[in-house]
Amino acid sequence: MDYRQAGVDVEAGREFVSRIRQQVESTFRPEVMGGIGGFAGLFEIPAGYKAPVLVSGTDGVGTKLKIAQAMDQHHTIGIDLVAMCVNDILTTGAEPLYFLDYLATGKLEPAQLADVVTGIVEGCKQSGCALLGGETAEMPGFYGAGEYDAAGFAVGIVEKSQLLNGSQVNIGDVAIAVESSGVHSNGFSLVRKIIESNGWQWSDCLPEWGGQSLGEIFLEPTRIYVKPIQALLKSGINIHGMAHITGGGLPENLPRCLGQGQSIQVKAGSWQPLPVFNWLADKGQVNSTAMLETFNLGVGFVVLVSPEQRQTTLDFFSGQGLVANQIGTVIEGDGAFVWLD
């Protein structure tokens, strides 16, 4: 008996690395030291920092993976994976430097996971970070046929004096919401339950979606905010805080960027939720509170600025081709999310 008979195909692993090598190297920045295949990835800290702070984050894509696997469409999941990590570290004011991935599967299918890496490469290019390395684990008996899981890890850098940590936020600051591209990568256990309870398949094309399948609609990749937010930070607009709207929606995530003695007040109707959220609420009979506490509702990222810079910030995002709205205000409080109907 050998390792292959036990379910681990070393040759498939070599084929996979061969397939992705050129793509991975296309993401390399000048600071990358060496190629792929070593025991560790090496990255030189960029020059020009007086007191550099490294910022790290890790995340996954959750059960959105189930949709990709059902549709046999894997090229966008990698974008989601990068987005979930780099958008998180972006909230500190950090520039993403490099990314690493962990892929695990029951049987390594080189073409399938190469498609996942294609998305990871695209996400890295959108965020300007290098795909420095990764791990692919073949675990027979652990995952079903065609199943895999994915996790990502991002590291960024910010000048210590420019680090956003809540201390810059002031009472009266306004919250500017930047549009999401769709559901992003949170709430998919509920999405899947709604689809299943209505007896639909992911390949179904419903009239209201103009010929797109349900799978295509819900596999829309998470928007990566790195380039517009990095441009905003360099524009002269004084950003006081930022939040990435992920699991738990606005109520869970907005308070995370506040300082001591502060709460955030958000006004209903101050932005227009994307049609997909109204559709989910209707087809799943999900009440407004559950929708607010589960999904981003069309808000993927929020920046806090002074009232004096409100219009300049809105104009900036408009110039970037992004829809933005003032949705709330920082008030005195104990870290609460206050919803105004």
Swiss-Prot record:
Which residues are in coiled coils? none
Which reaction is the catalytic activity of this chain?
A: 2-formamido-N(1)-(5-O-phospho-beta-D-ribosyl)acetamidine + ATP = 5-amino-1-(5-phospho-beta-D-ribosyl)imidazole + ADP + phosphate + H(+)
Mention one GO molecular function.
phosphoribosylformylglycinamidine cyclo-ligase activity
Q: Which Pfam families match?
A: AIRS, AIRS_C
Q: Has keyword Cytoplasm? A: yes
Major subcellular location class: cytoplasm
Q: State where the protein is found.
A: Cytoplasm
Q: Name one GO biological process term.
A: adenine biosynthetic process
Which keywords accompany this UniProt record?
Answer: ATP-binding, Cytoplasm, Ligase, Nucleotide-binding, Purine biosynthesis
Q: Which GO terms describe its cellular component?
A: cytosol
Gene3D superfamilies of this UniProt entry?
PurM-like C-terminal domain, PurM-like, N-terminal domain
- Disulfide-linked positions: none
EC?
A: 6.3.3.1
- Pathway named in the protein's UniProt entry: Purine metabolism; IMP biosynthesis via de novo pathway; 5-amino-1-(5-phospho-D-ribosyl)imidazole from N(2)-formyl-N(1)-(5-phospho-D-ribosyl)glycinamide: step 2/2
Query: What family classification does the UniProt entry report for this protein?
Result: Belongs to the AIR synthase family.
Q: Would you tell me the protein name for this molecule?
A: Phosphoribosylformylglycinamidine cyclo-ligase
Q: Which organism is it from?
A: Synechocystis sp. (strain ATCC 27184 / PCC 6803 / Kazusa)
What gene is it encoded by?
purM
